[in-house]
């Protein structure tokens, strides 16, 4: 085992990376409220794991979506637990994100030189809400259907460009299979990818600039 570690150490300098992480200075004013961002990240990772597990059984069609969710809940081993954890961690992620934003704002973490960190955080907040909107529709029950119909119909009030935006979101004039397909693609591929990219940027900037000082 030692020889394997030495082989990787010689090429990747693992110990130097570990020492840099461990030796990072943590200001004395940091308290439990500074952990809210990390908790949000943990919830996201739980979402990815449980969501990936459900993709093996979920069917993104208007005819089979609801039945496939019921199948996950009743027939798949621990399916009820996986979906429940997915839902609970989704709610927790939104709550922790909101509390994290308040903490950063109240402690002045958005001020120079951390403006870009704040911008990426706001983008992540928008992506988090988008997860909720797209995921809500996937069971394709009455609540999900009407939620999608209302949300995608909001831009219709915008003059000139409203109707094209609605059609872009729905995939057609009305809510149907193309809408579910688009929301499924957004929820399982586009949004996770964007979130991972912006989270990486967010944490790299925090790593570079450090945690903001007390007010």
From Swiss-Prot:
Topology relative to the lipid bilayer, per the entry, is: Multi-pass membrane protein
Enumerate the residues binding heme c.
35
**Pfam families in the cross-refs:** Cytochrome_B
The protein's UniProt keywords, in alphabetical order, are: Chloroplast, Electron transport, Heme, Iron, Membrane, Metal-binding, Photosynthesis, Plastid, Thylakoid, Transmembrane, Transmembrane helix, Transport
Looking at the UniProt record for this protein, which Gene Ontology cellular component terms does it annotate, in alphabetical order?
Answer: chloroplast thylakoid membrane
Query: What SUPFAM superfamilies does the record tag this protein with?
Result: Transmembrane di-heme cytochromes
Extract one GO molecular function annotation from the record: oxidoreductase activity
InterPro entries documented for this protein: Cyt_b/b6_N, Cyt_B6_PetB, Cytb/b6-like_sf, Cytochrome_b_N_euk/bac, Di-haem_cyt_TM
How is the cofactor bound, as the UniProt entry phrases it?
Binds 2 heme b groups non-covalently with two histidine residues as axial ligands.
Question: Record keywords: RNA-binding included?
Answer: no
- A single BP term in Gene Ontology: photosynthesis
Where along the chain is heme b 2 bound? Answer: 86, 187
| Entry's localization field | Plastid, Chloroplast thylakoid membrane
Q: Which residues bind heme b 1?
A: 100, 202
The similarity comment for this entry is: Belongs to the cytochrome b family. PetB subfamily.
Instruction: Give the quaternary structure.
Output: The 4 large subunits of the cytochrome b6-f complex are cytochrome b6, subunit IV (17 kDa polypeptide, PetD), cytochrome f and the Rieske protein, while the 4 small subunits are PetG, PetL, PetM and PetN. The complex functions as a dimer.
Fill in the misc note: Heme 1 (or BH or b566) is high-potential and absorbs at about 566 nm, and heme 2 (or BL or b562) is low-potential and absorbs at about 562 nm.
Q: What is this protein called?
A: Cytochrome b6
State the organism's lineage: Eukaryota, Viridiplantae, Streptophyta, Zygnematophyceae, Zygnematophycidae
